[in-house]
Amino acid sequence: MARKSDEDTNPMDKFMDRLRGSPGDGGPGRPDPSQRKVHFSIWYFILALLLIVWMQTYMGEQQSEKISYSEFKQRVHDGNVQNLVIEHDRITGTMKENDGPGRRFNTIRVEDPELVKQLEAKNIRFSGDVQNPWLGLITWWLLPFAIMIFFWSFLMRRMGGGPQGVLSVGKARVKIFAEKEITITFDDVAGIDEAKGELEEIVQFLKDPGKFQRLGGRIPKGVLLVGAPGTGKTLLAKAVAGEAGVPFFSMSGSEFVEMFVGVGAARVRDLFGQAKDHAPCIIFIDELDALGKARGLNPIGGHDEREQTLNQLLVEMDGFDPRSGVIIMAATNRPEILDPALLRPGRFDRHVAIDKPDIRGREAILRVHVKEVKLGSEVDLKKIAGMTPGFVGADLANLVNEAALVAARRDRDEVTMADFQEAADRIIGGLEKKNRAMNPKEKEIVAYHEAGHALVAMLLPNVDPVNKVSIIPRGIAALGYTQQLPTEDRYLMTRNELLDRLQVLLGGRVSEEIIFGDVSTGAQNDLQRATDIARSMVMEYGMSERLGPLTYTRDPRSAHLDLGLGSRERDYSEMIAQEIDEEITRIVEDAHEKVRATLKRERGCLEKLAKILLEKESIDGEELKQFCQEVKSHIARDPVQVEGGAA
């Protein structure tokens, strides 16, 4: 289509184009469209209100002259007034002029019983009038205000936003990024090289579709990005659009569904219609599970509008030509609840898994985020990556930002390794609360509790090494913590490793039993985690010798979320349920007895570590390494073998 020349363009369209700003030319320093709309609306209402006030004042002054009541009485006495109208609170009329029409005037009415007699004596014509108080309000305020709102709504629609009215609820609330507005490329995405490699083919198709079509190949219509929250699914989708240099249509799955029946389906049709007009382009639907949940998954209280919207999405994905250059990308962290029809070949026929990054991936992500940060010479990104297992891209970005804030709070010129350590502790354990007052008895209990965890971890062979022990309160409920860091990324755990982890979790409570002959509530979280491990060993992993290699649960867990998606479905007898309970109890009690025997034997080391904690409140680095070596040397000289592993 030929572009209109400047001469053919409507002046109103030119003006609105200036207000909107042409797509794609928003550079640094240029306000985004939403800011322009806000600024325009503020100035519009200020000027409109000033105009209304000015019109009332000016027009009132032009229509009549205000005079005092004494001057009015004098003019009545002189016979220089005519056509008086006496209202409830004022008197209006016309002054007689010798050389032209009379001037209108008004005055405040005063309670004057003699006025009517004087008017009759002077043969002045007068009448009474009852004024409606609402008429002036409507005429001078409500009507101008309604006109002002109408024009504002019209201008907002012309600027591409604002209230659209009932007739436009079916329009897709899509965020459109033009080619020049997307500055993110694959260089800004790190730690997920496998996923980037999967999507390079999509970029090549958008750049050169003929390369694939000449051999009869068909590019995937849809790409589903699956991964845990914060792994970079949205960032990766934008990077694909940035690499290909095509428009990017972004919309959340929850924005399709409304309370009005049919609105979601209309928005799906509108979204695909806009995308076809801007092809080649990318449609990105974030949180697809809000829209694409399997039909019939919740038959009681189901959502007909959501299912109707999903049906329309399925129809649209079937209806467009894959050669049109429109690629659909979506992201979810709950693929197991999506409708099977959405995942079949021909719709989302390519699934790209985005896992949590390994240590090399975390180091690469950190290098991306520290580009604008002044780092100290001793900062080791590889070491930071090693002490942040399980962190995803969003967590690492937050870590770098927190470290920079810690350094700024301490008035440093650069971010040091200590700042990164403090930031990691803050993210993992919560805000440090040195001012939380604990009495000496509580502090001693916490010290022995954490010393018990740390000492058991030092003595057992199948657990992660201890990195830091602290009795400084953090977060909402943590009065102390023992930090263990893995030496490498792990994807499997053996039975012996799980049993040793049980012993570490029980070390704090057993330490309290041995030293004080009593237990506290501080072990609540430890006991919960220990019970969960034992239950999983029996019911999910088949690690119970008594029950054998069987699984006794149908818990619909998400592979990308640390929670179950529903209640466990029980399909075993009461006798098996009793045996499961007995086996879970046995595993935990066996671990408890082993820890008790170990800490009784190493009570001297336990008391020494607790004493250090009471003095310094926190142990890490070289001092902790030295203590660990002393403990291991002591154990090497002791002929008694530390119990660990099989139960």
UniProtKB/Swiss-Prot annotation:
GO terms for biological process: protein catabolic process; proteolysis. Keywords: ATP-binding, Cell inner membrane, Cell membrane, Hydrolase, Membrane, Metal-binding, Metalloprotease, Nucleotide-binding, Protease, Transmembrane, Transmembrane helix, Zinc. SUPFAM superfamilies: FtsH protease domain-like, P-loop containing nucleoside triphosphate hydrolases. InterPro entries: AAA+_ATPase, AAA_lid_3, ATPase_AAA_core, ATPase_AAA_CS, FtsH, P-loop_NTPase, Pept_M41_FtsH_extracell, Peptidase_M41. Its cofactor is Zn(2+). In the central section; belongs to the AAA ATPase family. This is ATP-dependent zinc metalloprotease FtsH. It comes from Syntrophobacter fumaroxidans (strain DSM 10017 / MPOB). The lineage of its organism: Bacteria, Pseudomonadati, Thermodesulfobacteriota, Syntrophobacteria, Syntrophobacterales.
